[in-house]
Amino acid sequence: KLYKMKKFLAILFVGVLFSALNFNNSEANTLTIKKNRVIKTKGDVFYKWPHNWKFSYIMEHWKPYAIQEITDNVRYGKTALRFELRSGSCGKTAGSDDCKNGPFGSERYELLPNNNDKDITFKGNVWHTISWYIEKFNTPLAGHNSIWQIHNDGDWAPMFNTDLMFDGLYWQRRTACNVPDIYKKYNAKGNDGCSVSWKENANVKIMDRNEIFDKWNDVIMNVNYTSKDNGFLKMWINGKLVYHYQGPVKPPNKGKGWSNNSTMQFGIYRMAEDGVHPHTQINYYDEIRYAKKKCSKLKLEQLGYSCEKLESQKIEVDTLFN
């Protein structure tokens, strides 16, 4: 009887321990998502951000591991977001099918502005930040791989996006694709016919490969969101000014289908030229902060930066007509 009792207690202990572990795993993720794709977080990933976020695909493509709010790898504070994109994870958005994007499709787990019920756009002089951490991976395939973008919700070209290449991280500017006097020369308009290779666009390397993986990287941006020539974008990475653009940022507003509502979106968006990416990619994001006009409102001293030192830096300016 004593042996049976010990055996029973041992089995009971293992069962309780297993249940506790499962409970902790399920409780570790504090992100929830509604049927309308809108997410809700409980932690401190976002600071003063002016709008909510929604998942990039329709809900039939949602996976519990796709985007989680976690506590075990954070840049600052208590929580960060963990994105996990597995091979073959293409899907449908509200108006398109990434599985039919190119010969092998594209894959996208991103967070977009929640514009289900209202227009969302940034206007004028804005400061915003995003910190990211990418687990190291290797892929034999060429293509594109975006970490975050400055985008619009019309058919215009994305104005700015990152591209993670084999040798490092590139910042791609396509603002020329949204300027009528320029895109008409190429018999193009917006995303239709746009190419980063146009002489009026730019593709600038901003980080070497050995600076990217398995560490937190902090991005600070100061953007004047306007379609006028006095627009600009300055970007610092880990406290160093790496890019400065002067010129229109937002596209013109051409009405239905050609809205120029523009903000930041982030997550994993990738496409390979000669196959489907074979690897699982894991990105973390944290410290997504927003302020109007003044750097000081971002409280960057919490992350170890001085607005005065940031704003004193200079770099060659990129324009439409360099």
Where are the model-predicted features located?
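Positively charged n-region of N-terminal signal peptides that target proteins for export
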Residues: K1-F8
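Intrinsically disordered, low-complexity segments enriched in polar/charged small residues
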Residues: I11-L12, S87
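Sec/Tat signal peptide C-region and signal peptidase I cleavage site
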Residues: N22-A28
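Low-complexity, Ser/Thr/Pro/Gly-rich disordered linker/stalk regions
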Residues: A28-N322
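Bacterial N-terminal signal peptides
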Residues: L12-A20
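N-terminal leader/targeting segments
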Residues: K1, G15-V16, T319
